[in-house]
């Protein structure tokens, strides 16, 4: 069993999603958004750090998965996003959580089956995979999708390791 915290970083709205993985089964534990309604960036970063720390304390995750920064057309926006990611990662590292990063395209490919999927498609698939009664908010759905991606990637890596181990023992299943 593992608990995974997924984070969709943003300087104004940071989505979070928490799921539990038992074997191949995924279950929803919680999700939401950290909203920073102050204007100055240092205060927003402080709120993101405090919010992520509180979520970690509440859910006690085993793994922390976060979206990688993509190349934005606006350099200022990309820098702010990078800073928001940075404080979220520091919050995880301060709690001694292993940090995993996933590209947005990889997340969409894993959850929807198409790397260019729309936000509404991600929301729908997250709802379906986690058997939720309604679509989660867009930022929370993205965070849940990041957590789901971590489960799939880590499960595939484990299966590959087992296959390699069996090959070194002279057996292939």
From Swiss-Prot:
Signal peptide: none annotated. Its cofactor is Mg(2+). Binds 2 Mg(2+) ion per subunit. Its EC number is 3.1.21.10. The keyword DNA-binding applies. Pfam families: RuvC. Mg(2+) 1 binds at residues 8, 139. Coiled coil: none annotated. One of its GO terms (cellular component) is Holliday junction resolvase complex. The active site is at 8, 67, 139. InterPro entries: RNaseH-like_sf, RNaseH_sf, X-over_junc_endoDNase_Mg_BS, X-over_junc_endoDNase_RuvC. One of its GO terms (molecular function) is magnesium ion binding. Keywords: Cytoplasm, DNA damage, DNA recombination, DNA repair, DNA-binding, Endonuclease, Hydrolase, Magnesium, Metal-binding, Nuclease. It catalyses: Endonucleolytic cleavage at a junction such as a reciprocal single-stranded crossover between two homologous DNA duplexes (Holliday junction). It is found in: Cytoplasm. Its main location: cytoplasm. SUPFAM superfamilies: Ribonuclease H-like. One of its GO terms (biological process) is DNA recombination. Disulfide bonds: none annotated. Mg(2+) 2 binds at residue 67. The RuvA-RuvB-RuvC complex processes Holliday junction (HJ) DNA during genetic recombination and DNA repair. Endonuclease that resolves HJ intermediates. Cleaves cruciform DNA by making single-stranded nicks across the HJ at symmetrical positions within the homologous arms, yielding a 5'-phosphate and a 3'-hydroxyl group; requires a central core of homology in the junction. The consensus cleavage sequence is 5'-(A/T)TT(C/G)-3'. Cleavage occurs on the 3'-side of the TT dinucleotide at the point of strand exchange. Homodimer which binds Holliday junction (HJ) DNA. The HJ becomes 2-fold symmetrical on binding to RuvC with unstacked arms; it has a different conformation from HJ DNA in complex with RuvA. In the full resolvosome a probable DNA-RuvA(4)-RuvB(12)-RuvC(2) complex forms which resolves the HJ. Belongs to the RuvC family. NCBIfam families: PRK00039.2-1, ruvC. This is Crossover junction endodeoxyribonuclease RuvC.
């Amino acid at each position: 069993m593992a608990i995974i915290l997924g984070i969709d970083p943003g300087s104004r709205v940071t989505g979070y999603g928490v799921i539990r993985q038992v074997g191949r089964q995924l279950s929803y534990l919680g999700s939401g958004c950290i909203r920073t309604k102050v204007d100055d960036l240092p205060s927003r970063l402080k709120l993101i750090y405090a919010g992520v720390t509180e979520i970690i304390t509440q859910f006690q995750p085993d793994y922390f998965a976060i979206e990688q920064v993509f190349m934005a057309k606006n350099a200022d926006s990309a820098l702010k996003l990078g800073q928001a990611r940075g404080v979220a990662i520091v919050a995880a590292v301060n709690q001694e959580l292993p940090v995993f990063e996933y590209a947005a395209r990889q997340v969409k490919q894993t959850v929807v089956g198409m790397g260019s999927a729309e936000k509404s498609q991600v929301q729908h698939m997250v709802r379906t995979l986690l058997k939720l009664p309604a679509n989660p908010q867009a930022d929370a759905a993205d965070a849940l999708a990041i957590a789901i991606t971590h489960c799939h990637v880590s499960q595939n890596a484990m299966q590959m390791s087992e296959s390699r181990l069996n090959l070194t023992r002279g057996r292939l299943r």
